[in-house]
Amino acid sequence: MGGARPDRIRFNVGGQIFETTATTLANAGRNSFFGVIFDDNWDVLYNEGGFSQSQELFIDRNPDCFAVLLNLLRTGDLNIPPNVSEKSLYREASFYGILDHVRAAKWGQFDGNRLRLSRSVSGRAPGDGTAIRAGPDGGCCVAHGSIVHVYDWMLEEHPPLNLDHQRVNDVGFIDADNIVISACERLGTLDGGMGLFSSTTGELRYKFEVSHINSHENKDRDKGAKKGFTAGALCVNPDDYRIFSSCRGRSNEYGIGVWDQVTGKQMDFFYESPGWSLGDADKLQWLGGVYNCLLVATLFPRKDNCYISLLDFRSRDMVWSWSDIGAPLTLTVVDEKRVRDAVAMEEANSICVVNEYEDLGFMDLRMMMGSRSTSIGSIRWSSRSRLMKGVMPDEPCYPKLAVHGGQLFSSMNDCISVFCGSDWVLTSRLKRSYGGSICDFSIGGDRLFALHSEENVFDIWEVTPPPIIL
């Protein structure tokens, strides 16, 4: 071995000898198991690393898995032989700190126009699911009644979550390790509300509490006392570790609560004003960049009217709002223009809404910031989907909207439509024949998850990784 080349490194893994190059190991990245053998210039630290060029590094791990992972680092291709189980391989990849390489080899970068159905998962919970949320690492969680079922990126189920066994209203990932749940209040107790859980063990780490301190709305109440509340729609701001939730308390204790993700302590509470709706919100979305605001949408049929707002917590002001209050209650308006969902598109400086026939409408935020509109005419509606009339299923699901990577997604019945470009042209449809209408969908971790209403099943859509060009 005295004649070994300077860029060669030898390993003894579980009694089996492997030889590779420093270049191959460097592909694992600085934060991997192999990163410690390189200096800042990516030269091998032979002496400082505790080994010499002629010495084998012993690793007491599975050699069959190591061979697969070494080939992955060398070629970018993941080939798993029959004698290696995927679960064992993923466990070894986690040990070496290269799970991200494995995931990248299994499915490609997200693109709505290249998605393919990967698999479907049937749950064991009774009744229909109510919400599905994608995790940042390719896992997901599904809310069924008072239980949340958690799946990792390998789609193996972890211990289920519940918050005092109260009905779950919303759920979301803080990060790959933490999930927040909002639930209904049990009258006469402090049960329900919000809780933060470990996504792997199911442990309740802490409950979020709400109090109303020195507020004009609560000047005659016990200031600072903990209050029971029903938490609704959730939103996370990853930039400053804030969690937002719509809250329904007693009397006029309705609004948007704000908590610190790390400590669980309440930071703020934005009270709804008379004649408006915040505490019953269906959807919250954080807008960063030039807006730095929270979108709050309360929609039909939760309320008789629709309310969409942008809240600036720095100035504690509602800087923009829209409602269909005062719109003519003709059949045309009621049947065709009821807003069922809304999503802000920061890059396009607009808010997109959808009605029950999947007609899309757009409001330009640049022209309307600082104003309040109560005219349904302020929405520029498309009429792309008029053919949907007359073909609605017996129990249709309300359409849902999402924006990801500059693409717009809209679910309708058992199909998800993909729109692209400045004019939001329909470019793709995602559909399968089993499970019934899609009641919810979510995008994250380079995957799209679709939850069906008629069967306890959800689909996983992925992009097939590009071929390795030799």
Predicted features by range, described:
Residues M1-T24:
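N-terminal BTB/POZ boundary and linker segment
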Residues R10, I17, R30-L99:
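Canonical BTB/POZ domain core
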Residues G108-D128, Y151-E157, R384-S385:
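A short helix->beta-strand "capping" segment at the edge of beta-propeller domains
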Residues R124-R133, H165-A176, I213-N237, G275-C293, ...:
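Canonical WD40 repeat/beta-propeller blade segments in eukaryotic WD-repeat proteins
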Residues D137-G138, A176-N178, D239-Y241, V290-L294, ...:
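Short coil/turn segments that connect the beta-strands within blades of beta-propeller domains
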Residues A143, S182-A183, S246-R248, V296-L299, ...:
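Residue-level marker for isolated small/hydroxyl-bearing positions within beta-strands
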Residues V150-P160, T189-N218, R248-L278, L287-C293, ...:
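Per-blade loop-tip surfaces of WD-repeat and WD-like beta-propellers in eukaryotic adaptors/scaffolds
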Residues G435-L470:
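Blade-level signature of beta-propeller repeat domains, shared across WD40, Kelch, NHL, RCC1
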